[in-house]
Design a protein with these regions (language model features):
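Substrate-binding rim/cap in mid-to-C-terminal beta-strand-loop elements of soluble/periplasmic
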Residues: 24, 96-105, 133-199, 203-214
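Short, solvent-exposed turn/loop segments enriched in Gly/Ser/Thr/Pro and often Arg
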Residues: 59-68, 115-123, 201-202, 221-226
């Protein structure tokens, strides 16, 4: 194999890399990790081009910076921070390709572009890829406790960047905002009333999203992989530990 597992990723081998679980499907179900970024990016660019003259919604999920971290040869060894750094470079290229497509088609000013993550950072996530050894002083969690899978702040604080030249002035927004509130906020932006029972946990935070509200939402509820709950209100974060839980299995 070309990438050895550290824990849990030791089942079906595809593209020379052992995976989580067992997979079947024959040749048509196989893939090459090094090409995933190019394939997804090209499909997204083609979709945008095909729908440039009409309203469209595109959700684009990338493989980067998730494991297994296998960058295209264009990026392999270029960061000086190992494969984790290399796939971050690859992700940066992907974002640039999408933004360039919007610019070249002349629709960037009236397109809402959102970049975000689904969880906080994780370094060793199942493969012996030297991600931790090659951080070179970088601290992805900063000073926060926890990380991916955790209900602590480093597990749920994520990058959230919005570009919409016609609607949002460039700047930084420090007001708290939850991904759950994107649904109701976009509905408000589109003047689309939500029927009873639709996205009941989502709150309209449009002014926060647009950067005109400095207060933000009153509270944010967080949940980890083991269903441990925490709540953030102002400068206070409370995590509720159940009787059988310890600090070790929350981090």
């Amino acid at each position: 194999v070309k990438m050895k597992p550290s824990q849990g990723h030791n089942n079906t081998i595809i593209n020379g890399i052992p995976r989580i679980g067992w997979m079947t499907g024959g040749k048509s179900a196989l893939w090459t990790d090094e090409d995933i970024a190019d394939v997804i990016t090209d499909k997204a660019k083609n979709f945008i081009t095909a729908h440039k003259d009409e309203p469209f919604f595109l959700y684009m999920g990338t493989q980067d910076v998730h494991v297994p971290r296998v960058p295209h040869p264009r990026f392999a060894g270029k960061s000086g921070l190992g494969v984790r750094g290399d796939v971050i470079l690859q992700l940066d290229w992907t974002v640039g390709e999408i933004m360039h497509t919007l610019d070249s088609l002349g629709i960037a000013d009236n397109t809402i572009f959102v970049f975000c993550s689904d969880n906080g950072p994780v370094i060793d996530d199942g493969y012996q890829d030297q991600a931790r050894e090659l951080l070179n002083g970088h601290t992805p969690m900063k000073h926060y406790r926890g990380g991916k899978y955790s209900a602590f702040d480093a597990g749920t604080r994520i990058p959230f960047i919005v570009r919409w030249p016609n609607g949002i002035k460039p700047g930084k927004q420090q007001a708290p905002f939850s991904m759950i509130d994107v649904y109701a906020s976009f509905a408000a932006l589109l003047n689309h009333p939500l029927e009873a029972g639709i996205a009941p946990d989502s709150r309209d935070q449009l002014n926060n999203f647009l950067g005109t509200d400095t207060a933000g939402c009153d509270y944010i509820v967080q949940q980890n992989l083991d269903n441990t709950l925490s709540i953030i209100q102002g400068a206070v974060s409370y995590t509720h530990l159940r009787a059988h839980e310890t600090k070790a299995n929350l981090v």
